[in-house]
Amino acid sequence: MTHGAVAPIQPWLVCLHGLFGSGEDWSPVLPFFRDWPMLLVDLPGHGASRAITTADFAEVSRQLTATLLEQGIERYWLLGYSLGGRIAMYHACEGHHDGMLGLLVEGGHPGLATPEQRTERIHHDARWAQRFRQDPLPEALQDWYQQAVFADIDSVQREQLIARRSANHGASVAAMLEATSLGRQPFLAARLQHLSIPFIYLCGASDVKFQTLAAQYGLPLLSVALAGHNAHQANPAAYAERVRTFLSHPVKD
């Protein structure tokens, strides 16, 4: 899905959503980017890409490169939220990223440091994937959104989110979760310190887990006020201001 004005010389803002999402998840911030060409990608197993599968981070990075080529996008900024942020970090560190001008990550985990942590996470995600395949999706999502990272969501917001996310196909999301488990992601923190392109790490001010990760690994943090893990949904105006300021005045240390 594309959005905004397209000028031949202007680079694109390419957006990658989180698990259970789609390109439509970026709708709250679109009014603030009417003058900016945007590509809202549906990741494998999600939205219009529900029937598309992927094996691992390397393949989804290649799929992203192919999508950009199909769209004729040669120069772009890459923005990813949560799962999309992890894919964006992998693409910047390990993928074929000619034409990529900068990286923007919102609440994405840079990776687990030890093999033991990664193995434990693979098993953890496999258990969730089994639930998404076997249980009624609304029932599984009730438990999914009780996780600590979603603590800032109130009961009304949680029910709205579950109703929206229940339109997904559980088995397709499960396959994507297993292929891109945090346990299968390389530990990217050190690589991120030495990127040759500008990089910012967006995080809701009340997202304690990811604020802590940003401090632990020295990520270039930009906090978004009055927001938790999903900052672009919680405070789109402040979020868009952070993004636009960075796009206008990127700094590479």
UniProtKB/Swiss-Prot annotation:
Family annotation (Pfam families): Abhydrolase_1
Annotated GO MF terms: 2-succinyl-6-hydroxy-2,4-cyclohexadiene-1-carboxylate synthase activity
Entry keyword DNA damage: no
Known pathway: Quinol/quinone metabolism; 1,4-dihydroxy-2-naphthoate biosynthesis; 1,4-dihydroxy-2-naphthoate from chorismate: step 3/7; Quinol/quinone metabolism; menaquinone biosynthesis
Stored InterPro entries: AB_hydrolase_1, AB_hydrolase_fold, SHCHC_synthase_MenH
Record's keyword terms, sorted: Lyase, Menaquinone biosynthesis
Biological process, per Gene Ontology: menaquinone biosynthetic process
EC number: 4.2.99.20
Domain AB hydrolase-1: 11-147
Domain of life: Bacteria
Iron listed as a keyword: no
Catalytic activity: 5-enolpyruvoyl-6-hydroxy-2-succinyl-cyclohex-3-ene-1-carboxylate = (1R,6R)-6-hydroxy-2-succinyl-cyclohexa-2,4-diene-1-carboxylate + pyruvate
Family: Belongs to the AB hydrolase superfamily. MenH family.
Chain's role: Catalyzes a proton abstraction reaction that results in 2,5-elimination of pyruvate from 2-succinyl-5-enolpyruvyl-6-hydroxy-3-cyclohexene-1-carboxylate (SEPHCHC) and the formation of 2-succinyl-6-hydroxy-2,4-cyclohexadiene-1-carboxylate (SHCHC).
Assembly: Monomer.
Protein name: 2-succinyl-6-hydroxy-2,4-cyclohexadiene-1-carboxylate synthase
Lineage: Bacteria, Pseudomonadati, Pseudomonadota, Gammaproteobacteria, Enterobacterales
